[in-house]
Protein backbone atom coordinates (compact mmCIF):
# COMPACT_ATOMS: atom_id res chain seq x y z
CA UNK A 1 0.00 0.00 0.00
CA UNK A 2 2.82 2.41 0.84
CA UNK A 3 4.28 1.90 -2.63
CA UNK A 4 0.95 2.50 -4.35
CA UNK A 5 0.35 5.54 -2.12
CA UNK A 6 3.68 7.03 -3.20
CA UNK A 7 2.99 6.48 -6.91
CA UNK A 8 1.76 10.07 -7.31
CA UNK A 9 5.13 11.47 -6.25
CA UNK A 10 7.60 12.59 -8.91
CA UNK A 11 10.58 10.57 -10.06
CA UNK A 12 13.43 12.86 -9.09
CA UNK A 13 15.96 13.75 -11.78
CA UNK A 14 13.59 12.60 -14.53
CA UNK A 15 10.77 13.98 -16.67
CA UNK A 16 8.11 12.00 -14.79
CA UNK A 17 5.82 14.14 -12.65
CA UNK A 18 4.38 10.98 -11.09
CA UNK A 19 6.06 7.63 -10.59
CA UNK A 20 3.02 5.88 -12.04
CA UNK A 21 3.67 7.64 -15.36
CA UNK A 22 6.90 5.66 -15.79
CA UNK A 23 6.37 2.34 -17.57
CA UNK A 24 9.30 0.88 -15.64
CA UNK A 25 7.58 1.73 -12.33
CA UNK A 26 4.35 0.07 -13.45
CA UNK A 27 6.26 -2.97 -14.69
CA UNK A 28 8.11 -3.36 -11.39
CA UNK A 29 4.88 -2.96 -9.44
CA UNK A 30 3.19 -5.57 -11.64
CA UNK A 31 6.13 -7.95 -11.22
CA UNK A 32 6.12 -7.60 -7.43
CA UNK A 33 2.33 -7.94 -7.21
CA UNK A 34 2.42 -11.03 -9.44
CA UNK A 35 5.04 -12.66 -7.22
CA UNK A 36 3.00 -11.90 -4.12
CA UNK A 37 -0.10 -13.39 -5.76
CA UNK A 38 1.83 -16.51 -6.85
CA UNK A 39 3.20 -16.98 -3.33
CA UNK A 40 -0.31 -16.65 -1.92
CA UNK A 41 -1.59 -19.27 -4.39
CA UNK A 42 1.21 -21.65 -3.41
CA UNK A 43 0.50 -21.24 0.29
CA UNK A 44 -3.27 -21.54 -0.16
CA UNK A 45 -2.71 -24.86 -1.94
CA UNK A 46 -0.35 -26.07 0.77
CA UNK A 47 -2.76 -25.00 3.51
CA UNK A 48 -5.62 -26.80 1.78
CA UNK A 49 -3.59 -30.03 1.75
CA UNK A 50 -2.79 -29.57 5.45
CA UNK A 51 -6.44 -28.88 6.28
CA UNK A 52 -7.60 -31.98 4.40
CA UNK A 53 -5.17 -34.16 6.33
CA UNK A 54 -6.22 -32.60 9.62
CA UNK A 55 -9.92 -33.06 8.87
CA UNK A 56 -9.23 -36.70 8.01
CA UNK A 57 -7.31 -36.97 11.31
CA UNK A 58 -4.21 -38.28 9.62
CA UNK A 59 -0.61 -37.23 9.57
CA UNK A 60 0.87 -35.93 6.35
CA UNK A 61 2.81 -38.51 4.38
CA UNK A 62 6.56 -37.95 3.94
CA UNK A 63 5.89 -36.90 0.33
CA UNK A 64 3.25 -34.39 1.43
CA UNK A 65 5.65 -32.97 4.02
CA UNK A 66 8.34 -32.63 1.35
CA UNK A 67 5.82 -30.88 -0.90
CA UNK A 68 5.05 -28.44 1.92
CA UNK A 69 8.72 -27.71 2.51
CA UNK A 70 9.63 -27.09 -1.13
CA UNK A 71 6.46 -25.09 -1.80
CA UNK A 72 7.07 -22.93 1.28
CA UNK A 73 10.66 -22.37 0.11
CA UNK A 74 9.35 -21.27 -3.30
CA UNK A 75 6.79 -18.92 -1.74
CA UNK A 76 9.43 -17.36 0.50
CA UNK A 77 11.76 -16.87 -2.47
CA UNK A 78 8.97 -15.13 -4.40
CA UNK A 79 8.10 -12.92 -1.43
CA UNK A 80 11.75 -12.09 -0.84
CA UNK A 81 12.14 -11.01 -4.46
CA UNK A 82 8.90 -9.01 -4.32
CA UNK A 83 9.85 -7.23 -1.10
CA UNK A 84 13.27 -6.34 -2.50
CA UNK A 85 11.66 -4.94 -5.65
CA UNK A 86 9.21 -2.90 -3.59
CA UNK A 87 12.06 -1.49 -1.50
CA UNK A 88 13.92 -0.59 -4.70
CA UNK A 89 10.80 1.27 -5.79
CA UNK A 90 10.57 3.04 -2.43
CA UNK A 91 14.11 4.31 -2.76
CA UNK A 92 16.41 5.19 0.09
CA UNK A 93 13.60 6.87 2.04
CA UNK A 94 11.94 3.47 2.27
CA UNK A 95 14.74 2.42 4.60
CA UNK A 96 14.14 5.20 7.13
CA UNK A 97 13.57 3.82 10.63
CA UNK A 98 10.13 5.43 10.67
CA UNK A 99 9.12 3.71 7.42
CA UNK A 100 6.60 0.88 7.74
CA UNK A 101 7.96 -0.56 4.49
CA UNK A 102 11.41 -0.90 6.09
CA UNK A 103 9.94 -2.52 9.19
CA UNK A 104 8.00 -5.07 7.14
CA UNK A 105 11.00 -5.70 4.87
CA UNK A 106 13.32 -6.21 7.85
CA UNK A 107 10.89 -8.45 9.76
CA UNK A 108 10.24 -10.58 6.69
CA UNK A 109 13.94 -10.91 5.88
CA UNK A 110 14.77 -11.96 9.44
CA UNK A 111 11.82 -14.33 9.82
CA UNK A 112 12.30 -15.97 6.43
CA UNK A 113 15.78 -17.02 7.46
CA UNK A 114 14.51 -19.19 10.33
CA UNK A 115 16.04 -22.65 10.17
CA UNK A 116 12.71 -24.31 9.32
CA UNK A 117 12.57 -22.29 6.10
CA UNK A 118 16.03 -23.36 4.89
CA UNK A 119 15.38 -23.52 1.16
CA UNK A 120 18.68 -25.23 0.36
CA UNK A 121 17.89 -28.24 2.54
CA UNK A 122 14.25 -28.35 1.39
CA UNK A 123 15.22 -28.16 -2.29
CA UNK A 124 17.92 -30.81 -1.89
CA UNK A 125 15.51 -33.14 -0.11
CA UNK A 126 12.87 -32.61 -2.79
CA UNK A 127 15.41 -33.15 -5.57
CA UNK A 128 16.48 -36.38 -3.90
CA UNK A 129 12.85 -37.49 -3.90
CA UNK A 130 12.38 -36.52 -7.57
CA UNK A 131 15.36 -38.73 -8.43
CA UNK A 132 13.80 -41.62 -6.51
CA UNK A 133 16.77 -41.83 -4.17
CA UNK A 134 16.51 -42.81 -0.52
CA UNK A 135 15.82 -39.83 1.71
CA UNK A 136 18.96 -39.37 3.80
CA UNK A 137 18.93 -35.60 4.16
CA UNK A 138 16.19 -35.08 6.71
CA UNK A 139 15.19 -37.19 9.71
CA UNK A 140 11.80 -38.83 9.13
CA UNK A 141 10.10 -36.57 11.68
CA UNK A 142 11.47 -33.44 9.95
CA UNK A 143 10.49 -34.23 6.38
Regions found by a protein language model. Name each.
Residues 38-74, 84-95:
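C-terminal helix-coil-helix/basic helical segment that borders enzyme active sites and/or dimer interfaces
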Residues 92-143:
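Glycine-rich phosphate/cofactor-binding loops in nucleotide/flavin-utilizing enzymes
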Residues 4, 26, 47, 65, ...:
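Generic detector of well-ordered alpha-helical segments enriched in charged/polar residues
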Residues 2, 78-85:
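Generic non-transmembrane alpha-helical segments
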Residues 1-52:
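Extended amphipathic alpha-helical segments enriched in small hydrophobics
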Residues 25-28, 35, 42, 71, ...:
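Alpha-helical structural motif
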Amino acid sequence: DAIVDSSARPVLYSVFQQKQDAASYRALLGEAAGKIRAARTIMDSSNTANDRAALARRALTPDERLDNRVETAAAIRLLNEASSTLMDMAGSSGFAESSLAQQYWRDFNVGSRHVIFNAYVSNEAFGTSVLGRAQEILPADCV
